[in-house]
């Protein structure tokens, strides 16, 4: 493929006109604060987790050896199978992510600081079709930066929970809360018609720092006031632990993201931001759409990887915008169908940063 930047941008704009499902990984949060990333979480777990005795202690020792040996957190946590140790990891993870989120909630939600997704969400929501004004966002992130950004933009959003001080999961009720009655002309008279507001439907497929589940797993609630501090007795944060064992946990909590499965299965395109392709249970549906069904997609992320390359080779219309590895200066590579072996190199450009991508493309 004879590709230049103008042609690439035209391709991207064509994909974005399809109103893509937005997939947001931790890279988007790290653009605001690196503490949202796995390396900083690994350090916090290393410092803070106090394992129990017996197999708990043995498994945690293997995790620490792996981390000290240079393994990433996801791989290191493969050693964890004990429920008690998983709960300790969730407790520390939730408290740590909540503490970082707390540093930003006011500044981002009031617009004092412009979050990295601010411009992107503005463009996507403003471009929603009136016949289906819904922007689906799928994220494995525990933090609430997407929610804060929507608040700053005054964009209505729902994560599937009802309204209230403590909210229950009810997607039907949540969607209905996005309806507004309008008076529309019908011949010589007017008729009241229910219309959806342009809004975001947020699918938090690994749970969230403001989700809580009771110990017998019969109730799932969202409570923003309980984000800071430990959960009440008999409750724990509803978060799927990092590590590849999350596939098993996801299977046990499939109802959390059944709506995400539906959004992915019906997507006309995907815009994938700061995502590491480490979640098989989510990616299965995305890959089916991109590879088996010829759906279009764009990956915008800092790090080029063999995983991204493999997906592009197997897909008919998947593109990646990444930092040029080893360039030693601001430089972007654009890779798409037909030029995997010879990427377009954009010197003095940082289009892999979502803010710069939005400026150049949207």
Regions found by a protein language model. Name each.
Residues 281:
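Polyanion-binding interface signature
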